[in-house]
Each structure stands twice: as C-alpha cells, then as structure tokens.
Amino acid sequence: MRIDGREKDQLRTVKITTNYIKHAEGSVLIEMGDTRVVCTATVEDKVPPFAKGEGKGWITAEYGMLPRSTETRNVREATKGRQSGRTLEIQRLIGRALRGVVDLKALGERTLWIDCDVIQADGGTRTAAITGSFVALALALNKLVEEGILPVIPLKDFVAAVSVGIVDGEEILDLNFEEDSKALVDMNVVMTGSNRFVEVQGTGEEATFSMEELQRLLTLAQKGIRELIELQKQALGDIARRIGMENAADSNSQ
C-alpha cells in the first residue's frame, strides 16, 4: 500500500473541469490528486516567422508555477528576469506532445497558444499539464469548427501523459511529490490513444534499471494513459467522437 493508500497501478483521483476560464477559446482545470493545473488554449491568426508561407499552423506552449503552488514560496520567474531550464524543458515537452496529434496543415496558418499554470503542485505537474492541455486544445479547435473556420477538428488522435517510477523497490503509477522525491527511477511517458509513444523521459536516480523493468514501467504507464484518455473523452462529451474523423475520411477516400 502506498503513502496515500493507492494500489501500485492506481492513478490519483482525476477531475477535469472544462470551460474554466471565461475568455479563453478552450480551457480546463485538471486535478490529479493534490496537483492542480489550469490549461488554456488561445487561437492566433498568424504563425511564427519560421512557419510563414508553409501553409500550416503551429502549436506552442508556456508553463509556469504560482509562487505558493509549492510548500514554500517560489520567486516568480518574471521577477528573476529569466525562465529556468526546467520550465523551458517542460514547455517544449507540452508543445511536442500536442503537435504529435495535430494535423498542422489542416489547421492552416494559425497558432494555438497553450498556457499551463500550476496553482498547486504535488508531483506530476508536467504530465497533468499535457493531459489537461489536450482537452483545452480540443475545445478551442471545436470552436473554430462551430464558427465555420475549419471543416473538421484537425486532431488525429488523443494524447495524455503520466509518470511511473520505482519507489522502495516497487514499480508504481502516477507518483505524488513524496514518492517522486525518493524514487530510484522516475519516468514521464506521453502516449496517444492508439498506443503510440510521443515521448519517454526516464532517469535513474543513483540507480540503474533493466530492460525488463523498463518494459514493465512502460506497460504500467500505458494502463494509466488509457484511463486518462477515457477521462478526456468524458470531459469532451460529443466533441470526443469527432476527434480522428479527418483520418477516417482520408482512409475511406483511398
């Protein structure tokens, strides 16, 4: 039994609240245990300079933590005048995860800005941000369809993320902060609804891990991600059934 009473292969309690922010085209509050992240998606009718004239869109992400999202106050990065390496890494991870399931050509020359703000942190903030951001992105893209700007939602698949690790010799799913702090192996896994990997980040902390342990951790992550994608579908309701339709239409026309 784990610190919080969960089984080894059990996610924390997950809640996804849609349309959490009034002004954003898409927004959610995702809660995974005591970790809470606000994710918004904003549509901008232009692309970065490097993408101009390419006939396709772009997805970019920003990530930050409120000063008292943690046990002791963190100084805002804006006050420091620079973003940390950790923040930059997480922003890139979120962007890559989402671009992996978006048909950028079908999106057209527009940018979707994804903003992830951690309001309370208890481990797994980057994975929660990815899972929540996908829902916010889907809501924003659906709005473009409803407004007649896009014919279909340009999402090829679902995507979600979860952490796995080895703590006290046990392979466990969805680590909280206390578990993460003493994990011998810590891994973040990003996967699609069709069981394809977008990213795997795995590190041994003063330890190594075997191929067999890696395989078991990936299988554990796959189980958690399947459950998270089901929760994404529940949060999106009817919109969920229209995700991947463009791929289906392409297959039928071949």
UniProtKB/Swiss-Prot annotation:
GO terms for molecular function: 3'-5'-RNA exonuclease activity; tRNA binding; tRNA nucleotidyltransferase activity. It is an enzyme of class 2 (transferase). Pfam families: RNase_PH (PF01138), RNase_PH_C (PF03725). Signal peptide: none annotated. Keywords: Nucleotidyltransferase, RNA-binding, rRNA processing, Transferase, tRNA processing, tRNA-binding. GO terms for biological process: rRNA catabolic process; rRNA processing; tRNA processing. It comes from the Bacteria. It catalyses: tRNA(n+1) + phosphate = tRNA(n) + a ribonucleoside 5'-diphosphate. InterPro entries: ExoRNase_PH_dom1 (IPR001247), ExoRNase_PH_dom2 (IPR015847), ExoRNase_PH_dom2_sf (IPR036345), PNPase/RNase_PH_dom_sf (IPR027408), Ribosomal_Su5_D2-typ_SF (IPR020568), RNase_PH (IPR050080), RNase_PH_bac-type (IPR002381), RNase_PH_CS (IPR018336). Transmembrane segments: none annotated. Its EC number is 2.7.7.56. The keyword rRNA-binding does not apply. Phosphate binds at residues 86, 124-126. HAMAP family: RNase_PH. Phosphorolytic 3'-5' exoribonuclease that plays an important role in tRNA 3'-end maturation. Removes nucleotide residues following the 3'-CCA terminus of tRNAs; can also add nucleotides to the ends of RNA molecules by using nucleoside diphosphates as substrates, but this may not be physiologically important. Probably plays a role in initiation of 16S rRNA degradation (leading to ribosome degradation) during starvation. Belongs to the RNase PH family. Homohexameric ring arranged as a trimer of dimers. PANTHER family: EXOSOME COMPLEX COMPONENT, EXOSOME COMPLEX COMPONENT RRP41. This is Ribonuclease PH. It comes from Carboxydothermus hydrogenoformans (strain ATCC BAA-161 / DSM 6008 / Z-2901).
